[in-house]
């Protein structure tokens, strides 16, 4: 096994885009701290894929709705991976509700996972990092308004502002950037056919795939002169 470039903590890394990012980071030379909450079997499968790349992987269960559990996550990871130098805030929840229909629990769930947890994870990550990078996974909706998913859209917008604010404060020791995917995967339980139908209205007239998101994440990590940037991986949907 070659010497790793460091270690990456990927939240929500058990499946979907998170699993693709975590596995790509392993291929790119990073050991991986794979966070999950309820998807234990999927996390174990992704961990095996990472280890097949010749890198170490450890699983970290944590409920990001719980502040105490969230506050303990980075210290737990550093016990296993002292060279933690990449944080990918990918964990997400996606629930439909307009402003009128959004209850307190749904609101807090979205803001806890999309904003509060990344805020405190970034804070803890930066405390003991002299050359690190944070990548926040957003959504192309941050460029507009989606009243059908009020809490989701607003919480992702808050994460975009955190990206910019943290980039200004934490440099040069820590760079902070974001990737905003568009039509990549349907929501859990959704169908690809619906995305393909909607993609006809995009400038590029097709849906993307997880490899497109992964490429943007790796580009940002590898480029030492980019911070505070958001890369839209959405086929032009944000235009």
Please give the residue ranges for each predicted region.
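Catalytic loop of short-chain dehydrogenase/reductase
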Residues: 96, 133-171, 183-184
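Catalytic Tyr-X3-Lys loop
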Residues: 93, 100-119, 135, 152, ...
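Conserved Rossmann-fold SDR core element
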Residues: 25, 160, 170-184, 226-233
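The beta1-alpha1 cofactor-binding region of Rossmann-like NAD(H)/NADP(H)-dependent oxidoreductases
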Residues: 40, 61-72, 104, 210-212
